[in-house]
């Protein structure tokens, strides 16, 4: 049985969902320490002006560094009305895409309901996105942290927003994008880009 080890993600990239789809079992890490500028609380979308990163703010504890907090304990901040900002950005970027209206009612609630913990928020997103993709991965969460797990394909640092590492099993496939005529094809964006542009054919690109 093949097993992949992944970080938790906020509307993660296509590569992340490919692993969910192709592996027999997926473990999601919840005991690692928080790091800035990762897919844990960031997704990347294509807009009229190019790529845009949408980041979920997390609470900072004045008594200890945020970077010492395990991901399972990270709380979402309500700073700067980020929910409204993110939803408006998605509307602006994808309102002209073929399937935005079709999926809007499934996605909008994530920008209306408040979640306390980032990992619970991300898990709710994962379940909904998997339903929309019509994939049914076997997902569980780690019980402790292992730096070098055995008999598992570890993608925790491979699927990295800032410094991605080689992944021979992931070859991005071109699909239609709203702003491709301006910026060219943008690979491995948030799974939302694939869903809004390709609809129920999105699964064939995983």
Outline where the language-model segments fall.
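Residues lining hydrophobic/aromatic ligand-binding pockets adjacent to catalytic sites
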Residues: 1-206
